[in-house]
Amino acid sequence: FKPLLFKAFTLADRAVRTILLKILPKVAERLTKYEIQDKIYPNLVTGFLDTDITVRTETLLSISYIMDKISDRQLNNDLLRYLAKLQADTNPKLRANTVVCLTRISEKMQPTTCIGVLITAFGKALKDPDYVTRLCAIRGFESSIDYFSPEICCSKVLSSLSPALLDKSSVIR
């Protein structure tokens, strides 16, 4: 079963990749860290660059199922680069899901990386034209507030959040 799964992840066929991404939650628990890191992850992240929105979305959603098994380098370098690109995606739902994904993986990030990444990502999301993405950023700050010292909260977090008090959407205010 495993060799076939690893081979299938190397295929470029979108239909196959989408199905693999949808079943990943069921098979990820049966795979070792090594298998995720070396056989699945390198092929999985190519889905972030796909032109099809379904593949990009399924790739993003699958990250939460493998985040415990990918290496620190894969999480803190490679994955964060892909997520930064997704924040500029044309699809608002994908941008919102990117913020949610960042919030989820923040507990696995290196502390030195986490603070800067979250402030930058949530700050950018708060300027997004889509109110759902802005709301996800506010909830992301709320969920990760323990990562920030009082000094950082006052100097960076509040300065990112304060324009939301004047947001045109009442949900955001």
Regions found by a protein language model. Name each.
Residues 5-9, 23-31, 47-48, 62-70, ...:
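Hydrophobic residues within the alpha-helices of tandem HEAT/HEAT-like
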Residues 115-173:
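Alpha-solenoid helical-repeat scaffold
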